[in-house]
């Protein structure tokens, strides 16, 4: 079984600071600390559980700037077999429509897969659109809001998914795209052995930086060396995927973020009431005055 997992490095929305909006309506992610989107970690965990039971491999892919390689190294620490960074300046400012187009074409290039996993949604946009849109572009079934994988057969999977007021059991043919809820599983911790093994994994962009100003290092040789050590993170650009530029980045994105802000709930005026019988009487009187009681 081959599982491809869509992961994302997201801005830590709990710590919004500085000027995070650009004039063109896109988010300046460099102004925010970056973290591994939690539901994507859970999606990776489910993919790894399938590998543990049935064998096969797990490939983690992400679309983002060069620094998004950090989240791919975390995937390798957790147990992924391969990692792919999809990065190009022409992808900047992509909304879910443009993102799903790029991801679907990357998945087609990787090919030969049984499952595509993704978190239900990312905490930066909360749209829950990329997974379903990617499935549509791939022309494969999709099951969203997954709580549990119940059974896997050679050509099908049975899944429990959350719905309003309960759950439903669905069976789908393979390949299938599955979006995962945050409580579907608990992500395994990173293993020290894998951290030591993959902490030096590098993308092509990072290898190119190593060769800058060093005439003794040649990028092709360095790439070959890292590939032989299984430390190379495959890097795909718009040209590698032969994409339509009009469908990428800002040009292919009809959606724009109008505003983002940190909402702080501040307490108003309050009155301390003693925790005794007299205080209880005062509290009841005030609740009755406000028509909360009586």
Identify what each model region corresponds to.
Residues 1-294:
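N-terminal glycine-rich FAD/FM-binding segment characteristic of electron-transfer flavoproteins
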């Amino acid at each position: 079984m081959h599982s491809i997992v869509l992961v994302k490095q997201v801005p830590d929305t709990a710590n919004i600071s500085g000027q995070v909006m650009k004039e063109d309506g896109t988010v300046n992610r460099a102004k925010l600390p970056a973290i591994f989107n939690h539901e994507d970690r859970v999606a990776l965990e489910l993919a790894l559980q399938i590998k543990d039971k049935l064998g096969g491999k797990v490939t983690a892919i992400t679309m983002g700037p060069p620094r998004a390689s950090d989240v791919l190294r975390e995937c390798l620490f957790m147990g992924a077999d391969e990692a792919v960074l999809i990065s190009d300046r022409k992808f900047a400012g992509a909304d879910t429509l443009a993102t799903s187009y790029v991801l679907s074409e990357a998945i087609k290039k990787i090919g030969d897969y049984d499952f595509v996993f993704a978190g239900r949604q990312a905490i930066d946009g909360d749209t829950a659109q990329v997974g379903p849109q990617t499935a549509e572009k791939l022309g494969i079934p999709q099951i969203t809001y997954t709580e549990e994988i119940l059974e896997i057969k050679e050509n099908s999977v049975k899944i429990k998914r959350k719905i309003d007021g309960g759950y439903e059991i669905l069976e789908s043919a393979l390949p299938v795209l599955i979006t995962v809820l945050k409580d579907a599983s608990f992500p395994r911790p990173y293993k020290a052995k894998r951290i030591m093994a993959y902490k030096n994994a590098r993308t092509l962009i990072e290898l190119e930086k190593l060769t800058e100003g060093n005439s003794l290092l040649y990028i092709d040789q360095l790439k070959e060396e890292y590939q032989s050590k299984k430390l190379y993170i495959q890097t795909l650009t718009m040209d590698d995927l032969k994409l339509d530029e009009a469908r990428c980045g800002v040009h292919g994105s009809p959606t724009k973020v109008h505003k983002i802000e940190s909402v702080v709930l501040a307490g108003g005026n309050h009155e301390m009431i003693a925790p005794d019988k007299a205080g209880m009487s005062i509290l009841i009187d005030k609740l009755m005055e406000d028509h909360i009681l009586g």
